[in-house]
Amino acid sequence: MKDKLFKIVLVVLSVVFVASCSKKMPELPEEKKAYVADYLNDGFNGVDISKDGRLEKSDVKKIAANFNKPYDYNGEEVVNSLDTFFYGESFASPQDITLKNFVANFPSKTLDPEKDKSQIDELKKQNPDALKQTRENAKILKVDKNLVDAVLLKYANISSDDVTNKENVVYSKDDNSYYVMENDEEWALEPVVCKVNSKEIILEDDIKSELKLIQKGGKFFIKSFELSPNACCE
């Protein structure tokens, strides 16, 4: 009986494990697939991380070249997919990102206060506080949820459904889009140091902000981000 119960538990755990590792990339048109890219793995391509310690400056520069690198999306300069994770806040894991600030970094469509008034009114009914202006002329942005999920899967192996902090975000099932207010400030990470150990890879900028990465199945994923206390003074 114990053996049978053990086998059942094993099967259940196996199903859960497979399900957790087999998240499908959302269907995207070509221009959005190109936007998602894979800046982490591209940056580390050809870089030897087999030994613990600090990487050479030349390797760090190669990796850092993919950070804070504007992307031309249909003729508009936007934040690239990797940089969407950096908006001036720390997170202990990707599930802890502030979804509103993360989403507001994406390529988006701006709603017109006059032409889209009826739509805006409907969105505000869902979440009256989410679309309050934090400053004059702040814009309401519409962002494709599939694009958000694709970036999260690429860099963190999660989807936006896994994110816990969904305050100030309105989701519309009708068009599978997120609606958020634009961010008040811009932020960027520019690594100058890369440390390698057996458990993780740590990228630091010049004010000691830390991005930690892990490897799974030969691919790099974001583990956490710690914003330097000095960031407020920069």
List the predicted regions and their residue ranges:
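Bacterial N-terminal signal peptides that target proteins for export
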Residues: 1-9
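Short, linear, compositionally biased motifs with a strong N-terminal bias
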Residues: 12-15
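C-terminal motif of bacterial Sec signal peptides marking the signal peptidase cleavage site
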Residues: 17-20
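Secreted/luminal cysteine- and crosslink-motif detector
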Residues: 22, 195, 232-234
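Flexible low-complexity loop/turn motifs enriched in small/helix-breaking residues
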Residues: 24-198
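Short beta-strand segments that buttress and anchor functional surface loops
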Residues: 201-206
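Short beta-strand edge/turn micro-motifs at domain boundaries
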Residues: 208-234
